[in-house]
Amino acid sequence: MAAKDIDDTKPDTAADEDASFDMSQAAVKRMIGEAKERGYITIDQLNAVMPPETVSGEQIEDVMSMLSEMGINVVEGEEVEESEGGEVVETGSGSREIAVAGAAGETLDRTDDPVRMYLREMGSVELLSREGEIAIAKRIEAGRNTMIAGLCESPLTFQAITIWRDELLSEEILLRDVIDLEATFGRSLDGDEGMEGMEGIEGPVVEGLDLETAEGAAPAARRPASDEPEYDADGNPISRIDEEEDDDDSSNMSLAAMEAALKPKVLETLELIARDYAKLAEMQDLRMSATLNEDGTFSVAEEAAYQKLRSEIVLLVNELHLHNNRIEALIDQLYGINRKIMSIDSGMVKLADAARINRREFIDEYRGYELDPTWMDRMSAKPARAWVTLFEKSRDKVEDLRHEMAQVGQYVGVDISEFRRIVNQVQKGEKEARQAKKEMVEANLRLVISIAKKYTNRGLQFLDLIQEGNIGLMKAVDKFEYRRGYKFSTYATWWIRQAITRSIADQARTIRIPVHMIETINKLVRTGRQMLHEIGREPTPEELAEKLQMPLEKVRKVMKIAKEPISLETPIGDEEDSQLGDFIEDKNAILPLDSAIQENLKETTTRVLASLTPREERVLRMRFGIGMNTDHTLEEVGQQFSVTRERIRQIEAKALRKLKHPSRSRKLRSFLDQ
């Protein structure tokens, strides 16, 4: 269908956005025909038909979307394979052979357009099928489960969970700070029974779902809004953030209601975890004692019971669906302790190197015996000269390092080797989940661009919109649950929209206005537009306040805030030879009249003071700061003249009496009215 649209495009209508590029060109048709035969097209071929100088990044993205709809993949370079004779045989149409002397491969056209570079790199990642999305989602889930299982082997995790339970009971923290409310509440509604063993996704699978038919598919997709932007009376675009949030408020429970519904069950689960952990801690102590003491034993049956109890606790922790911030805090705690252990290990290895002990031999003897109290005695009894040297020269340092290691072991509650294994398991699960999330994000970058294009010309650059949309996409990947049966793109669309509209509301204005105030402004504008149609005129603030059931002062405040800033360089007049800034009073500038009066007062004062004796003139100038940076006290003036302060006071009084004489005062009296 897309190919037919391209072929039927008329020359006079194909270049609405850019007259220099015409989809009906023979070169474009030929390119599409060859691409259909091969099933792919290279970036080089696109660049040849659409030069960077004449085609915008958005047009390139539109063409790439059309090609994708036709089943044509956009790849970095030609798919080539090397023949036995050293030649490179191209697998494209015509089976042309390209002889190469050395390394083959054409250099891609270079461009400094960031949008074009981004689109080129994005085009190299293939789109995911529904099965591919499910496979990646399962990898993310498996990585998270591996990470949670590792955390559950650390006593520090259960100590933290016990603290969180106590803080919840004492209401020091909210339930939303401990668990992911939406994910936990969604699971409780869905009921995971019978869903764990699904190979494919049964039920309401929404393949190729259109947004207008997505009712009930995604949590936030119950009432899809139009993608077309709305404009106010002045032609300015209006953000629809508040509309979308109103929809969310009407269709979703509030966080407080979710907390009230989930808190009893969560506290019950936390109580079970605390009870089981108390048993597990006793078994861990016995297990650790058996590890440290050669005569200690931990039977096979006890080990089986230990593993069973640990598995039950892992299941309980998974049921909680802990908040990502809490999981990250636990991981950071583990990694911090691991860095401390590595620092101690490094100190021990340095001492061994100084004693010329083979590093591999030292590590073999050291690892696994970090908490063994007999290790130093056994190693010092070795006949090798290097070991004897180590304990002769550095025994105190070795004892200090092992004492630090013992403190760490006592704090973590498990053997150091076991702790290292726990950290490795957590790192492995985190790495697997992070890699799977990265693949999911990269495969859906096109979705971000298609949504970001609808929000251009709203105060943010296109690349900024893409960046904010990518942030929303990453949040969608974190929260996506493949078991619900809808496609990832359907769910991610709402996260991307919310991220973009939030950023526009937060960053687009020259003078930043908080998002909640933007929502109130939009609600006020929308109500005003509705009342304009009803009553045939602009509503007054009083009418708006009554309609919205909002205080009148708040309505006036919002209307004042809603005004758009105007540039001081705005042209004024028909000829536009002056700017708005030319007509605005500068409060800091001195008026010419005031400047003339000040200058005249200065000259008159100088002439009047000159009629006094030099001593009297200087005393008055110093006392009142005339012609100086500051005035002076009687004591300071007296020090200048080497007389007492009383004498200065007398001179000052005499000089002021002279100035009051009509022959002098009449010259200054006119300035008193100014």
UniProtKB/Swiss-Prot annotation:
Entries under InterPro entries matching the protein: RNA_pol_sigma-70_dom, RNA_pol_sigma70, RNA_pol_sigma70_r1_2, RNA_pol_sigma70_r2, RNA_pol_sigma70_r3, RNA_pol_sigma70_r4, RNA_pol_sigma_70_non-ess, RNA_pol_sigma_70_r1_1
Recorded superkingdom: Bacteria
Positions of the UniProt region annotated as Sigma-70 factor domain-2: 440-510
NCBIfam families in the record: PRK05658.1, RpoD_Cterm, sigma70-ECF
Protein task: Sigma factors are initiation factors that promote the attachment of RNA polymerase to specific initiation sites and are then released. This sigma factor is the primary sigma factor during exponential growth.
Similarity comment: family membership: Belongs to the sigma-70 factor family. RpoD/SigA subfamily.
Subunit structure: Interacts transiently with the RNA polymerase catalytic core.
Protein name: RNA polymerase sigma factor RpoD
Organism: Rhodobacter capsulatus (strain ATCC BAA-309 / NBRC 16581 / SB1003)
Highest classification ranks of the organism: Bacteria, Pseudomonadati, Pseudomonadota, Alphaproteobacteria, Rhodobacterales
